[in-house]
Amino acid sequence: MKRRRGAGNPISTGLKKILGGRGALVHDAGVLTPDPAVIKDSLCAVSRQLGFSGCRVARAEKSPHAEKLFQWLERGWHAGMEWMARSPERRTDPAEVLLGCRSVICLSYDYDSPAMRPEGEGSICLYAHGKDYHGILEEKLADLQELLSIYGGKQKGYVDSGPVMERDHAEACGLGWRGKSG
């Protein structure tokens, strides 16, 4: 799938709609800096245009479940998932992944739709229908990262594949919760 550029790009379209009449810069000790409220509004509006159903921002804090992860690894419960044991500190603290990180943007994307449900008797998990969601969402994240770069931000985007404990951040900002699997 080709990335959209120019006038049809949700980034440029979204920014024109959102910023019309509002200043994107505020004075901070005599220096013009991006207004966090405008950045958040822009981000959430563009994320909706890209098909995300939820957009929330959490503080980039160390995971409250860090100790549980360390114990889980110590006990060898990660079985053949050796990557889990590499740099566990990075999994529990966003600042270890991106120096100076202050916020974690959490997004949700609904993949349950009648069009995705196959006819017939058998059933499989809805996320397994259609194309692999990783590639689809990674492209959408690239568009959002482009928006944040316009404001001078440094960021990293992951689709359940990075070292961050995304459940903790999603729960902290009200976009998710911890189920029985912890």
Where are these regions (language model features)?
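Auxiliary alpha/beta "docking" domains used to position bulky ligands
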Residues: 2, 15-182
